[in-house]
Amino acid sequence: MRLIIAGGGTGGHLFPGIAVADEFLARSPENEVLFVGTERGIEARLLPKLGYKLALISASGMKGMGTIKKIMSAGRLLYGYSQSRKILKEFRPDLVLGVGGYASAPIVLAARGMGIRRFIHEQNAFPGLTNKVLGRFVDGVFISMPEAESFFPKEMTQMTGNPIRKEILWGFQERVRSIGDTFSILVFGGSAGAQRVNSALLEALPHLEGVKGKLRITHQTGEKDAARVREGYQAQGFQAQVLSFIDDMSAAYGAADLVVCRAGATTIAEVTACGKGCIFIPFPYAADDHQRKNAESLVHKNAGVMILEEDLTGERLAAKILELMEHPAELAEIEKNARALAQLDAAQAIVSAMVSKN
């Protein structure tokens, strides 16, 4: 069988697609996968390095644009639709899966016009406009959070969870916490980092002076902010490993007692799979404020803590860190609740559902 996985742009869209691709390829040596994305997305840089086939099309969003840019974007979408039909004719897939991102819509709509079975996966609690529209034209919708169910036709919607990269699942080893041990904090803001989160950690350090000797911090900053953050830790005498990018996230999760992070859907899938207590700082400019809704989904189940960026100060962040550090039973309860929300077989469920409907 042949599968096209369309979308990307960010790791939050791409990584679930990679997990599905790996599961599909593992089912049979005769199976083939082709990714379709745009040259500006993370897929153009990452997928060739990982050995996956990738076709590129023209596509961009329209939300928040002026009239001229919307017209230009519509032109790219029409051209992308034409490119998509050509790709479908050449690759001849049995199945198409849209995982979100600009490339998802042209391929899924072209597949509908050519009678190819097509599906979408929604990672977030609150779907974006593209997936809400595409949900009317597909044979199945896979969702990661129950809050998304009401946005799609009930008869074709399946709760699967968000597929997780196999290296996260296979490589994760829980760190055994002991009384009097150091307390390890993992900080990251997505694959590109998050300057506001980085600054908040540095602003929190004076308020953590009393536990300086116990803290061990691993901080993924993004490439642009690494030097500034590293100097900030050194100036205040805190032991921290500052990295522009963490290659082995499974080891980073395993070593962490607490995670400070954004609330993208892939991040939430990974931290729940690893049973980590988190302080979520949702990115306030995410489409339809979906990161806040993602975080709220966990906070309402006592499976995480949230600080909105508008309320974020170094003092407030330090207070939350100290509260969880000094009350291990409270942190353990959050970890237990987070782990209970994990759906480790999401990729298997999606592949099985697509194949069974073919």
Swiss-Prot record:
<protein>
    <recommendedName>
        <fullName>UDP-N-acetylglucosamine--N-acetylmuramyl-(pentapeptide) pyrophosphoryl-undecaprenol N-acetylglucosamine transferase</fullName>
        <ecNumber>2.4.1.227</ecNumber>
    </recommendedName>
</protein>
<keyword id="KW-0997">Cell inner membrane</keyword>
<dbReference type="InterPro" id="IPR006009">
    <property type="entry name" value="GlcNAc_MurG"/>
</dbReference>
<keyword id="KW-0808">Transferase</keyword>
<keyword id="KW-1003">Cell membrane</keyword>
<feature type="binding site">
    <location>
        <position position="291"/>
    </location>
    <ligand>
        <name>UDP-N-acetyl-alpha-D-glucosamine</name>
    </ligand>
</feature>
<dbReference type="GO" id="GO:0008360">
    <property type="term" value="P:regulation of cell shape"/>
</dbReference>
<comment type="pathway">
    <text>Cell wall biogenesis; peptidoglycan biosynthesis.</text>
</comment>
<dbReference type="GO" id="GO:0009252">
    <property type="term" value="P:peptidoglycan biosynthetic process"/>
</dbReference>
<keyword id="KW-0472">Membrane</keyword>
<dbReference type="GO" id="GO:0005975">
    <property type="term" value="P:carbohydrate metabolic process"/>
</dbReference>
<keyword id="KW-0132">Cell division</keyword>
<keyword id="KW-0961">Cell wall biogenesis/degradation</keyword>
<keyword id="KW-0573">Peptidoglycan synthesis</keyword>
<feature type="binding site">
    <location>
        <position position="246"/>
    </location>
    <ligand>
        <name>UDP-N-acetyl-alpha-D-glucosamine</name>
    </ligand>
</feature>
<feature type="binding site">
    <location>
        <begin position="10"/>
        <end position="12"/>
    </location>
    <ligand>
        <name>UDP-N-acetyl-alpha-D-glucosamine</name>
    </ligand>
</feature>
<dbReference type="GO" id="GO:0050511">
    <property type="term" value="F:undecaprenyldiphospho-muramoylpentapeptide beta-N-acetylglucosaminyltransferase activity"/>
</dbReference>
<keyword id="KW-0328">Glycosyltransferase</keyword>
<feature type="binding site">
    <location>
        <position position="165"/>
    </location>
    <ligand>
        <name>UDP-N-acetyl-alpha-D-glucosamine</name>
    </ligand>
</feature>
<comment type="similarity">
    <text>Belongs to the glycosyltransferase 28 family. MurG subfamily.</text>
</comment>
<comment type="function">
    <text>Cell wall formation. Catalyzes the transfer of a GlcNAc subunit on undecaprenyl-pyrophosphoryl-MurNAc-pentapeptide (lipid intermediate I) to form undecaprenyl-pyrophosphoryl-MurNAc-(pentapeptide)GlcNAc (lipid intermediate II).</text>
</comment>
<feature type="binding site">
    <location>
        <position position="191"/>
    </location>
    <ligand>
        <name>UDP-N-acetyl-alpha-D-glucosamine</name>
    </ligand>
</feature>
<dbReference type="Pfam" id="PF04101">
    <property type="entry name" value="Glyco_tran_28_C"/>
</dbReference>
<dbReference type="GO" id="GO:0005886">
    <property type="term" value="C:plasma membrane"/>
</dbReference>
<dbReference type="Pfam" id="PF03033">
    <property type="entry name" value="Glyco_transf_28"/>
</dbReference>
<dbReference type="GO" id="GO:0051301">
    <property type="term" value="P:cell division"/>
</dbReference>
<dbReference type="InterPro" id="IPR004276">
    <property type="entry name" value="GlycoTrans_28_N"/>
</dbReference>
<keyword id="KW-0133">Cell shape</keyword>
<feature type="binding site">
    <location>
        <position position="124"/>
    </location>
    <ligand>
        <name>UDP-N-acetyl-alpha-D-glucosamine</name>
    </ligand>
</feature>
<keyword id="KW-0131">Cell cycle</keyword>
<dbReference type="GO" id="GO:0071555">
    <property type="term" value="P:cell wall organization"/>
</dbReference>
<dbReference type="GO" id="GO:0030259">
    <property type="term" value="P:lipid glycosylation"/>
</dbReference>
<dbReference type="GO" id="GO:0051991">
    <property type="term" value="F:UDP-N-acetyl-D-glucosamine:N-acetylmuramoyl-L-alanyl-D-glutamyl-meso-2,6-diaminopimelyl-D-alanyl-D-alanine-diphosphoundecaprenol 4-beta-N-acetylglucosaminlytransferase activity"/>
</dbReference>
<dbReference type="InterPro" id="IPR007235">
    <property type="entry name" value="Glyco_trans_28_C"/>
</dbReference>
